[in-house]
From Swiss-Prot:
InterPro entries, alphabetized: Osmotin/thaumatin-like_sf, Thaumatin
Tagged with keyword Disulfide bond: yes
Entry keyword Secreted: yes
Cellular localisation: Secreted
GO BP term, pick one: killing of cells of another organism
Natural source organism: Senna didymobotrya
Protein name as catalogued: Thaumatin-like protein
């Protein structure tokens, strides 16, 4: 599976992911995603994505 992160906010965001079922993590610390940027990557099944939006 492929997952795409797109930042449509006016500010930089730091997505973080946590995989389940003993699968390798996509990132250990999250990653920077600047405003207007998209990135794609492989996502193992049962990937949880949690978004926290604050101003």
């Amino acid at each position: 599976a492929t997952i795409t992160f797109t930042n449509k906010c006016t500010r930089t965001v730091w997505p973080g992911t946590l995989t389940g079922d003993q699968k390798p993590q996509l990132s250990k610390t999250g990653f920077e995603l600047a405003s207007g940027v998209s990135t794609r990557g492989a996502a193992p099944p049962a990937t949880l994505i949690e978004l926290t939006v604050a101003s």
